[in-house]
Structures are given as C-alpha cells and as structure tokens.
Amino acid sequence: MKFFASCAKGLEYLLADELLALGASKATATISGVNVEGELRDAQRAVLWSRLASRVLWPLTEFDCPDEDALYAGVAELPWDAHLSVGHTLSVDAHVSGTAITHARYAAQRIKDAVVDTMRRQGLERPSVDVENPDLRLNLSLRKGRATISVDLGGGPLHRRGWRMAQNEAPLKENLAAAVLMRGGWPRAYADGGGLLDPMCGSGTLLIEGALMAADVAPGLQRYGSDVPSRWRGFDRESWQQLVSEARERDSVGRAALKQVIHGSDMDPHAIRAAKENAQVAGVAEAIWFGVREVGELQTPPQATGVVVCNPPYDERLAADAALYRRLGDTLQRVVPQWRASLLCGNAELAYATGLRAGKKYQLFNGAIECALIVCDPIAVPRRTPLAAPTALSEGAQMVANRLRKNLQKFKKWRAREGIECFRAYDADLPEYSAAIDVYQQADGDRRIFLHVQEYAAPATIPEADVRRRLNELLAAAREVFEVPAERVALKSRERGKGGSKYGRFEQRNEIVHVREHGALLRVNLFDYLDTGLFLDHRPLRGTMAQQSKGRRFLNLFCYTGVASVEAAVAGAASTTSVDLSATYLQWCAENLALNGLAGSKHKLMQADALAWLEAERAHFDVIFCDPPTFSNSARAEDFDIQREHVRLLRAAVARLALGGVLYFSNNFRRFKLDEEGVAEFAQCEEISPRTIDPDFERHARIHRAWRLTA
C-alpha cells in the first residue's frame, strides 16, 4: 500500500531517509513530501515517531476530477459508514492547484456535502463539523484534474509536539528544528559525548527538540497521551497501542540516561523564561541549562566537541542585522572553534555575513520564508582562509599529481582537435581523494588558468583529520600540475545525489572570468556560487544543437545562463528564445549575448515558468533544448517534479516543433525513468546519452541522460 508523508520544502530527502529507518519498504522524495510504500502500521509508526513529517496521509480514493460535480460524485461513491462512526465529527483540509476548482474552502465544503448526503441516504445520523479537533480529518489534494482523498492519520499538524506552553516571537516549527539538528549531526555528536549549544535560543525549540531526540522520546507521545490520533474506523487501535507501549519503554530508558550537555542563552529574559517553561512541560528541564546572555558574552562549554544550532532573527517581524550575524560567526570561532555548526539563516547573504566556511548548504522553507541552512565542520575554518600547500608534495599528493598528468596526456589530442579550453581534469579517479577538478582557461588577457574544485562529502566513517589531509594533498597536487596560485583555486563542497541548495553564495569576490566554448565567449563566476554558469558535461550536446541551428529558430527552455542560446546564435541561428523563471539567470544570459555582440530583437529573453509558457505559446521552432531541473519550488510558479511532469512537458514542447524540427531533452536526475509509452503517443524518441558524453566525463557517464524527439 502507498501513503504520503508531507513536509516543509527542502526536507524531502531527509524525511525519506527517516521513514526508511522507521521501517517503510520504499520512500521516494517528491515536492513537499515523500511517497511511501508500507502497511498501515508503518504509517501509524510514522505518526508516532517522525520528527520531520508535517502530516501522514492514508489514501481512501483517487479519481479524475475536472469540476465540482466530479468531486462530489467521487466522494459520494465511498462507503462512509465504513470510515466514520455515527455521532463522530468531521473536518476537511483541501489543497487545490491547476484545476477548474480554484477555492480550497469551496472544495472542502463540497466534500463535506458529499459525505453528509451519503450518510443521510443510508439512514444514518448527519455528522457534525469540528474544525479544531475532529474525530476524522480528511485531506483533499486536487492537482491538475486529479483528486486524492486521504485520512490525516495524525489528526493535524505533526510539528505540534504538545510541550509548547509559552513562546517568544517568531517560533520555529519543531519539525524544522529537528531538520536543523539532524543536518548538524546532533544524534551522532550526542552518542560521542558531545554537547549542544544555541546562543540565540528564543523559546528553546531547538534545544528542547534536541533533548527529546537525545532521550529517544517519540514526538507523538506527548502530543496524543493516552488518546489515539484519529477515530477513523479503519485505524488499527491494537497496533497503535503496541507502538505506544514500545515507545514508552524507550522513553523511560532514554530520559533516565539523558546527559546534561545542552546549553542555551538569549539576550531576552522573557524568551529564557518561556524556554524554561517549555522545557519543564517537555520533561527535559534538568538536562538543559538556560541563561540570559548576549551573543558576544558566550562562554566555552565543558564539552570539547559538539554542535551549535541556531536560528538567528531574519524575518519581517524581527529585523535582520548582518552585523549580528558577523558577531555570531566571530564568537563561535573564538568560543567553540572545533565544534560543528548548523545555522538556519534568513538567506544566503546573511549566511555569508557570518564569515564561516559552509561545508554544506541547504535550501529550506520556514513557512513561506525561504532560508539557507549552512553546516560548518569545524567552525574554526574561515571561508576565505586558503589551505596552505606543503613545500614538497607528500606521497599522497604525488599520487594525485601523477593521475592528473596522466589525464592531461589522455585528453591532449582530443582537446587540440576540438579546441577544448574548459574541461574536467579529474573526477574522484582515486577514490580516497574524492573531488572533481575542472579547468577553466581565460579566453582573453594573459589566458590564465583557474581551477574549480568540488569536494564530495566523505563517509562519516572517515576521520575528519584524514579528510582534511587528503583535501590539502589534492589541492597541492593540482596547484603544482597546473602551476596556479591559491587565489585562482575555487573550492566548493558538494554531496553526490543530494538535494542541497545550488544557489547559496560562497564568496563575494564578484570576479567574472571570460571563457570560450564552440567559438562563443561566456561569463563564468567560479567563486561566488556552487555552480559556475557553465555546465561542462553538456558541451557535446550544445555543439550538436549549435550546428543544427544555423538559419533556424532555436528555443532554450529552463535556459539557466543561456549558454546553449549563445552558441546557437554564434553558429548562425536565425533567432533564439530563452525561457527561465529566474531574472538573475536571464540577466546573465543577456550579458553572455552582449559579450558576443548578439543583443537585439532576434534574441528574446522570456521570464516565465517554462511549462506554462509552452502551453500558452503558439510560435514554432526548429530546434528546442529542454534541460529542466529535477525539482523546482519557486514562489512564482507551480511546483515542478521532472519525474511526474515530463510527459506533459515534452508533449507541450513537441507541439511547438516546426515541420522537420527536433527536440533535445536532457536531465541529471539519477533515478529518472522515461515514460516511453506516454511519450510515444506524440513523438518518436531515441535515447542519445552516450553521444552526449565527452572523454572528460566518461568516468561518470551517468552525470546526465539525453533523448532526441521528433514529431
């Protein structure tokens, strides 16, 4: 059976891992939630134990729903006497998008009408509505003409743990607090004897959640007490009581063993008072020290290692202050230099203001507020401090240098033949030196070489000292082989296959380097962002499209910085149209066009959601490039999931092909599966992935997949 666990945007992969650990047979991340395969007991366990989920929804029915009559009819078909007992109350939460029914409240009312009318026809008592505490809470998801009716097994939002009696201004939801703690590695740090510190603790959410996590307390125990979360007739009460009994045993053992290693402070005495009251209700007051202190007065905890968690002020109600973030970063480097930090900041600029080097960055949403979560490990490494190269290469560095020279020799003829100036020189060829090294050669001036180094996340089993040593050796080898100084080496940290943010700033050098590919000049920014503005793996596909675009109309969907458009224009395209929702990327595209003398009415830039734009557009194009993201959750457009939406997207794109036109579709989602039958209904499709991989990416040829479609 399949069910759905919803969560805040940005927590999907973390929640999927949690649900698998809780016993689900399969958990697949999607936008704002996880599709789960498991039994009802697994769903009920998630209600009791998930620290990250917002709701757990057990589906009752799914049907096509083009209008309100179809919604009513679909709900009325269900045997509601099997779901709702006589005398019990009802409530409906509705979420609608991309449908003829535009008002969620109206949709909820139609569902209530259908349930009430069905039970009346069966001669049963009319159920009453209780919005706050219903016996049965239903959930409607109505998206693009497809309705799913589910039981909310938790009876409401799961972030409500039941201990919050008092709060300071702008409280952090408990499930988001759990994510900050998990990303910071708090469970492992506690097991290793480390401490937990929040120097701006407010009403104590992060610390209380951390204490309950350390004590192995199920989040749902205090929320439900001796009650059941739902009086849905299908709810397995016997299984629930077994789960609760097991959780109480673990609770008793965990609380008894809870160590006093948690420290919280805040400059506001009212906030500290609220934090103490909340900790008392949660039953962890003895484990947490709270005190009134300004950030700069922070004192070194007795634990040698641990995790700093913090949610500094940033929203409209609490004025953001870059100086405060700078003071926070300086204080942490002075007081707990060897600790780890997990900081939920208002945005990337505020994260940068801390002055800390973020090894990992994640994009999260605190309600409607987009935030940047940075993880620093350890705190004491400033972001702009260059790693010192040894005067002579160590044995390990010499191994890396030898492999780099071998790769350069291997690529020499290919680079000369194709005129390749930007390429991947190394990609974890030696597994213990796990990083990618990209070479960017300046196209103008003295044609200097820059290196872009992306460090992959090391397994937790490898000691941090070994990770740092190997990174130093790799950097030393790269600088020697390419004869570049440290200031021309951009170092980034990145996890393979994870959903971390690509858009957080790393440095604010604002240094633009001009490079050349397929005869086009391009602007790249190697230092300020995780991605540079040029995806090197798509080089051969861009070349193919440029050759085919001469004298023809070229369309670039999800255009990013417009490199494919620029190269098509340089090759002689009659016109180019570049579509992206981001004004920043469109500006970058415009600058790339201008750099090649191509600005003008022949080259259109469209700020729009690509799918919506396609479905409204009537013009035709000869060559179309479609390289969508895996997920997109912009506030300006509907949520996008490439696995779910690709047939609709490709259908709309193929409809814009001129006679004899060709569409190139690519994506880098490792688990993507093309719906061949769905696509075959409107296009001929051929996978061309091997032909779109150049020699420098053959080591990891699954970096992207590509298809050629014709009408």
Swiss-Prot record:
Keywords: Cytoplasm, Methyltransferase, RNA-binding, rRNA processing, S-adenosyl-L-methionine, Transferase. Its EC number is 2.1.1.173, 2.1.1.264. One of its GO terms (molecular function) is RNA binding. SMART domains: THUMP. Pfam families: Methyltrans_SAM, RlmL_1st, THUMP, UPF0020. It catalyses: guanosine(2445) in 23S rRNA + S-adenosyl-L-methionine = N(2)-methylguanosine(2445) in 23S rRNA + S-adenosyl-L-homocysteine + H(+); guanosine(2069) in 23S rRNA + S-adenosyl-L-methionine = N(2)-methylguanosine(2069) in 23S rRNA + S-adenosyl-L-homocysteine + H(+). This is Ribosomal RNA large subunit methyltransferase K/L. It comes from Xanthomonas euvesicatoria pv. vesicatoria (strain 85-10). It is an enzyme of class 2 (transferase). It comes from the Bacteria. Its main location: cytoplasm. GO terms for cellular component: cytoplasm. It is found in: Cytoplasm. Belongs to the methyltransferase superfamily. RlmKL family. SUPFAM superfamilies: S-adenosyl-L-methionine-dependent methyltransferases. Specifically methylates the guanine in position 2445 (m2G2445) and the guanine in position 2069 (m7G2069) of 23S rRNA. PANTHER family: RIBOSOMAL RNA LARGE SUBUNIT METHYLTRANSFERASE K/L, RIBOSOMAL RNA LARGE SUBUNIT METHYLTRANSFERASE K_L. InterPro entries: 23SrRNA_methyltr_KL, DNA_methylase_N6_adenine_CS, RlmKL-like_Mtase, RlmKL-like_Mtase_CS, RlmL_1st, SAM-dep_methyl-trfase, SAM-dependent_MTases_sf, THUMP_dom. Residues 42-153 form the THUMP domain.
